[in-house]
Amino acid sequence: MSNDAVQRSVLPIPDRTGVGLTTYDAKDPDTSYPPVRELRPPAGAPNVLVVLIDDTGFGASSAFGGPILTPTAERLAADGLKFNRFHTTALCSPTRAALLSGRNHHSVGMGGITEIATSAPGYNSLRPNTAAPLAETLRLNGYSTAQFGKCHEVPVWQTSPMGPFDNWPSGGGGFEYFYGFIGGETNQYAPAIYHNTTPVEPERTPEEGYHFTEDMTDKAIDWVRQQKALMSDKPFFIYFAPGATHAPHHVPPGWSDRYKGKFDAGWDQLRKQTFARQKELGIIPDDAELTARPPEIPAWEDMSAEMKPILARQMEVYAGFLEHRPPRGPPDRRASRP
């Protein structure tokens, strides 16, 4: 369908109908009909990839002066923009609902996480039909759409394999393909996975090296390759939301061990170092002042000798979980990937 002829102010975009007399005469050499034209986005419409990392603070990633190495984020930041006043709701479901709809979270029924929904307006975890999700808007404009990873926007009473699926990614959420889990968290070694609305088992066991972040990444790579092979002229929208770094902090030991001893000085020293690096990077103003440590958080020097190694190890595991970069696939498939 010609982009110039498409009226995109109403969704779904009305079907194009032929004007004039329709005849069905096999003997008439002049019998013809309007060609079937598949809907496409406007010329030059880009591919869109949205990555949402869970429970990651402003000062965690090295891209923002944090102590945790995130080289991919650094490369993206070097070629793009970094925002230092990008606000979230500081809650899981509300932030996701706002991001995926472009609306205030109360406007889409997500004033709190789905597990504490009530019948109060703005808090029932039900997105109204008048609020179209971003993925649905793009899909109805000719995009291919897919979601991978965590989905925490489904009302708790609708999370079974029997639905209803109006608030699921591949139901009413606008995503043609979904591979991930429903809810706030899942075991990263033995996750409860859905393919669209069907429960599926991981292809490997933890003993065979399975990890959900690597699995969902592999599925996303496969989906993009299929998309480019079969519909290279059609742009795509991918929403990629791993379970990291929300609890449980499940990460292969090789990743968490990279940070052995890195946090032994404690959080008081760590926050000062991060603050200084953020000034060096220009992320915060030179005259910014470090906020006082909240009284609810004890000073590191007040922690007992028994607790310090435990708390430092928790920080090491978290750091490894954030840095964890999934491989291209299991060993028997890596050779086929560039």
Question: What does each model-found stretch correspond to?
Answer:
Residues M1-P338:
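Formylglycine-dependent sulfatase
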